[in-house]
């Protein structure tokens, strides 16, 4: 790729008969922070070691600033590219300062020793990563997180245009994790290139401008976080059910692994919500394995967004649209096949009064009693209040906890017949 600072061209890596990487293409430009993600054994560390010139590819080639890396000596390569290993265990009894000064080795002459300027650079960098005053301590005496920060500081002391970081935050708390990735972003803004393998998909989405997803040695997806982190792709590669949603504080994507679902005994439950009132109950009943349906929801409502992300069958209308008689008829098929319909707590006005009429078509109706943190049930017309009172007279009023217990009882076959009125 034209303009790439670091590039893998159809790179493969084989150990005996095992093909660890299979024809991987990757081009990283200046000003780009690329996160390499994937399950354990996908080939992330192998790819990073190939990019760094620490392993020779079985096929293909690695180019650094347009030059085949295999033709560069280690000192010349290290002047342009710094590698941080995820292994922070000490091999020799070095002080922190001695570890940092190893980053200056590529910039020294054959018989040249580090000078005051090199030591000053090391001290400034140590302060930059938040570890002032530990330069004379033994590297082996540091905690795992401190060692990782020192090794990251060493890559900064090396002063390269390309940085390759293998799980740089695996031993760090969230404060120091943010420090490392924020510093990496600063390097990118200066025109450098950063490639990092990242275990957490949410962290990768927050800090990286681009993600490369590896699966069994091949590139499964490559693009912006919102292009790569799609539930259908992640579920297939990782073998789990996930929910990908925007973080309301950062605007970046958060990936959550959904709990493994119980059987739910095949019971079908329809949820009628609004204003996000069905979100918590939907999540819990989904986890318990009930066959859920929902609606009628308004587009962009939290209920509708959750049902869509979980693949729950539901009916919806446009945002701010009135629920019409035709909408109610369309949704009746879901209510008619449900063993139980649950009417959640939400404000009822002209736009959604049709949901009360839909509840009246249920075989068995539970009216959810609002809790202290739930949306209050309020009415903006006497008609809505009258319809609700009629529904309430023939239904069971239950709390969140009581609903879960009642569904469990019914799914065990103890609740044949109609629900008692309350």
Residue ranges and their predicted role:
Residues 52:
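Helix-to-loop junction immediately C-terminal to a conserved catalytic motif
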């Amino acid at each position: 790729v034209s303009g790439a600072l670091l590039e893998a061209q159809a790179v493969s890596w084989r150990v005996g008969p095992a093909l660890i990487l299979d024809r991987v293409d990757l081009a990283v430009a200046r000003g780009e922070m690329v996160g390499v993600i994937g399950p354990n054994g996908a080939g992330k560390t192998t790819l990073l070691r190939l990019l760094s010139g620490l392993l020779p590819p079985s096929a293909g080639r690695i180019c650094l600033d347009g030059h085949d890396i295999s033709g560069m000596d280690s000192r010349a390569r290290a002047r342009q590219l710094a590698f941080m290993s995820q292994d922070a265990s000490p091999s020799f009894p070095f002080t922190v300062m001695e570890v940092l000064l190893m980053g200056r080795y590529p910039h020294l002459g054959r018989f040249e020793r580090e000078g005051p300027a090199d030591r000053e650079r090391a001290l400034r960098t140590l302060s930059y990563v938040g570890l002032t005053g530990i330069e004379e301590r033994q590297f082996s005496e540091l905690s795992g997180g401190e060692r990782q920060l020192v090794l990251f500081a060493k890559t900064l002391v090396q002063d390269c245009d390309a940085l390759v970081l293998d799980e740089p935050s695996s031993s760090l708390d969230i404060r120091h994790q943010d420090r490392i990735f924020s510093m990496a972003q600063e390097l990118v803004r200066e025109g450098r290139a950063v490639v990092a393998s990242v275990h957490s998909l949410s962290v990768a989405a927050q800090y990286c401008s681009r993600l490369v997803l590896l699966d069994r040695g091949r590139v499964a997806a490559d693009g912006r976080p919102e292009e790569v982190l799609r539930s259908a792709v992640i579920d297939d590669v990782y073998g789990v059910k996930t929910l990908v949603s925007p973080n309301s504080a950062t605007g970046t994507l958060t990936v959550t692994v959904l709990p493994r679902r119980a059987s739910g005994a095949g019971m079908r439950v329809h949820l009628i919500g609004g204003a996000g009132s069905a979100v918590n109950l939907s999540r819990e009943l989904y986890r318990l394995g009930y066959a859920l349906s929902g609606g009628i929801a308004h587009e962009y409502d939290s209920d509708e967004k959750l049902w869509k992300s979980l693949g729950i069958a539901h009916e919806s209308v446009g945002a701010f649209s009135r629920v019409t008689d035709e909408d109610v008829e369309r949704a009746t098929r879901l209510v008619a096949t449900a063993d139980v319909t649950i009417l959640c707590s939400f404000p009822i006005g002209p736009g959604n009064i049709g949901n009360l009429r839909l509840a009246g078509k249920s075989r068995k109706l539970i009216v959810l009693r609002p809790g202290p943190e739930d949306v209050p049930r309020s009415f903006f017309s006497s008609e809505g209040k009258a319809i609700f009172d009629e529904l309430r007279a023939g239904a069971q009023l239950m709390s969140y906890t009581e609903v879960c217990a009642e569904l469990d009882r019914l799914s065990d076959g103890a609740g044949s017949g109609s629900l008692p009125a309350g």
